[in-house]
UniProtKB/Swiss-Prot annotation:
GO CC annotations on file: cytosolic large ribosomal subunit
Any one GO biological process: translation
General function of this protein: Binds 23S rRNA and is also seen to make contacts with the A and possibly P site tRNAs.
Organism: Mycoplasma mycoides subsp. mycoides SC (strain CCUG 32753 / NCTC 10114 / PG1)
CDD domains: Ribosomal_L16_L10e (cd01433)
Family matches, as PANTHER family: 50S/60S RIBOSOMAL PROTEIN L16 (PTHR12220), LARGE RIBOSOMAL SUBUNIT PROTEIN UL16M (PTHR12220:SF13)
HAMAP family: Ribosomal_uL16
Name under which the protein is recorded: Large ribosomal subunit protein uL16
Assembly and interaction partners: Part of the 50S ribosomal subunit.
Protein family according to the UniProt entry: Belongs to the universal ribosomal protein uL16 family.
Entries under InterPro entries matching the protein: Ribosomal_uL16 (IPR047873), Ribosomal_uL16_bact-type (IPR000114), Ribosomal_uL16_CS (IPR020798), Ribosomal_uL16_dom (IPR016180), Ribosomal_uL16_sf (IPR036920)
Domain of life of the native organism: Bacteria
Amino acid sequence: MLQPKRTKYRKPHRVSYEGKAKGVKEINFGEFGLMALDGAWIDNHQIEAARIAMTRYMKRDGKIWMRIFPHMAMTKKPAEVRMGSGKGNPEKWVAVVKKGTIMFEVAQVNEQVAREALRLAMHKLPIRCKFVKRGEN
């Protein structure tokens, strides 16, 4: 699964996913992309499931770029544990996705195949998304 090799801090503060994206707002590598219409924390399993769905539909033709990576550890305390006594242990790795972020890019396939592959990926993600073309957004 996707996770960083090393982190400076084991238990980071929870970064907000409210507001608009600052960095990854345009398609830079491929011809078509998947843009987030909401903000959310997307975990490594969801990113991997979306990638596998696209790869299988395209039958390994074309090229896929993942523009998000789960850098942040989410912590959770065990069930039925009283409050206090420190922060919980790292449970999963998440990517902070804000509104307008391009999450995946696809190239070297026609638009119909790209649209269907990205539609399948949308169903694996917990947020609303839309299909965009290069230069359109």
